[in-house]
Every structure is written in C-alpha cells, then in structure tokens.
A protein has these predicted regions:
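A cross-family phosphate/adenosyl-ligand binding-site feature
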Residues: 1-145
C-alpha cells in the first residue's frame, strides 16, 4: 500500500501528478439507473486530497504537487503548494488537456517561479523529473563516508 510505504519511511518522496477527480457522488447506486424521462439530482462531495494528507506528514521526505487552474494560475498554485506542504508545485492550465504540447511553471515555497518549461508533454515531463532529481532527490541523498 502506497500510504503505508510513505508513512513507514520506505519512500523518499511523492510526485502527485494527477488528481483522478476532485469530487465523488455522495451516493453510489448498486445498479444502472434506468431512464425515466425526468431529471436526476446528483450530489457530490470532495474527495480526499492524497497529496495534502501525505504532505502534512512528510517529515524529511519531499513532495511535488501539480495544479491545473483555469484562472489566477500562479496565485492558486502557490496557495496549493503551501496548503499541501509541497517542496515544488508544477502549474499549468486547461490547454494541456488532450494536447500534445504543454507549458508549465515550476514554483518554490518562497513564491519563486523556478522555471517555465514548454514543449511536448514528454519533454516537459523529462525536464520536471530532472529538476526533482537536482533540487530534491540529490539534495537529500546521504553523503557517503
């Protein structure tokens, strides 16, 4: 279990690259809901925020979050970075959905825009991983005797 591995210190960090969904139905029907010709009410509640939960208990581990925002990108991403106890936050907009290219900002806890990365999603991901390796993984690696 990922949560157990994180809490027991077996994992050195977390890349919270995707939120499958922010909301879930309050009630789940056990069977298909048949059509009636009438509207149905769908009540939703927020899902648990895994990155925030693990970030609050990270200790010496590192946490990288991602924020897809439709407005006030940087401001909202920085608020998430702080609220989720992240070491870095990668921010982008909805134009990334179903696109082959992406543009992101990598933000630090002091509010700095570390860098802006643009290119194919693969190239952007490779650069993000290089930044994580350089700033978080290598920086916390024990120094050999």
């Amino acid at each position: 279990n990922f949560h157990q591995g994180f809490h027991k210190g077996r994992l050195r960090g977390l890349i919270g690259a995707a939120a499958p969904c922010d909301y879930r139905p309050v009630r789940v029907e056990p069977r298909k809901i048949p059509k009636t010709g009438q509207p149905i009410d769908l009540h939703l509640i927020e899902t648990d925020d895994v990155v925030a939960t693990l970030g609050a208990k990270k200790g010496r581990r590192w946490v990288v979050g991602f924020a897809l925002e439709t407005e006030d990108h940087r401001l909202r991403a920085l608020a998430k970075l702080e609220r989720k106890f992240c070491d870095l936050m990668v921010s982008n907009g909805p134009q990334a959905i179903s696109a082959t290219d992406n543009e992101v900002e990598v933000l630090t806890p002091d509010g700095e825009v570390l860098t802006t990365i643009a290119g194919t999603k693969e190239a952007v991901a490779a650069r993000i991983l290089a930044i994580i390796e350089e700033r978080l993984v290598a920086a916390r690696r024990p120094i050999p005797d």
